[in-house]
């Protein structure tokens, strides 16, 4: 019921765990750190299109068919939040897996569990 314009930030699970473990060793008490891949931010709509293209080989398409009554449902407004992990990277953390590879790995793991 939205146009998918909100921006989300993502981080591969292994990269996130490595960041958290690094914080346990090198992080400063009382400090806040952000664990997010600096290049893995994308709108929900663009993510859906990427999955349709890259993971479904363009066999599906993304359609936004938003009823006029959707505004009465109380959905949150679109957000454009780009998280900054510079502080964590200054401690030596570097994410390895990019957004497309995250989805490729997730889809392969879902096929394996069928």
Q: Each predicted region: which residue ranges?
A:
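C-terminal substrate-binding subdomain of Rossmann-fold SDR/epimerase-dehydratase oxidoreductases
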Residues: 1-114
């Amino acid at each position: 019921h939205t146009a998918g314009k909100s921006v989300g930030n993502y981080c591969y699970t292994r990269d996130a765990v490595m960041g958290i473990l690094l914080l346990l060793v090198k992080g400063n008490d009382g400090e806040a750190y952000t664990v997010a891949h600096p290049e893995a931010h994308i709108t929900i709509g663009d993510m859906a299109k990427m999955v349709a293209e890259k993971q479904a080989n363009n066999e599906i398409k993304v359609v936004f068919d938003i009823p006029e009554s959707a505004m009465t449902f109380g959905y949150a407004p679109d957000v454009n939040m780009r998280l900054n992990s510079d502080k964590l990277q200054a401690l030596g953390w570097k994410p390895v897996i990019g957004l497309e590879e995250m989805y490729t790995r997730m889809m392969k793991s879902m096929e394996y569990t069928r």
